[in-house]
Amino acid sequence: LPQSPGVPPVNSAAELERCVRELGFIGCNLNPDPSGGHWTSPTLTDRHWYPLYEKMVELDVPAMVHVSSSCNSNFHATGAHYLNADTTAFMQFLTADLFKDFPALRFIIPHGGGAVPFHWGRYRGLAQDLKRPLLEDLIKNNVFFDTCVYHQPGIDLLLKVVPLDNVLFGSEMVGAVRGID
């Protein structure tokens, strides 16, 4: 979606509709941090995003929550910024009632959910302490994780702790991170 710092996401709703209706898109990329690592946008659960979410629900399309590059030297884009954003998105969903307002809204968190699978017990405990729904109930029809984690042990952990109905196959574009497993 076309997003810029300080520009309301309602401006992206028309482009989402055009892409779905005219070009056959089946989802969109939602950048929770168009500032490039300075995090100036409201949380993903803030009403700031609601006009876009209304359009996503109307069109029945999910959003992949994925930041773009980092202009902040504290956060390497692929090694920190991406994974921080994945983890942050999950925590924002855990602490708010977004899915009560939008029961049909769907998000895909890439990179196996960032640190979420590794700290599933921490998030389960936080949900209990905060009197939130069980994690399995929280994500049931709304939050999905992909398998793009670059090595089999990471995929194994993801499949062990996250409900299987919430895991989608995902692979990376050629060349994002190169290595041999």
Where are the language model's segments positioned?
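H/E-rich (His + Asp/Glu) clusters that bind or coordinate divalent metals
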Residues: 74-95, 102, 106-181
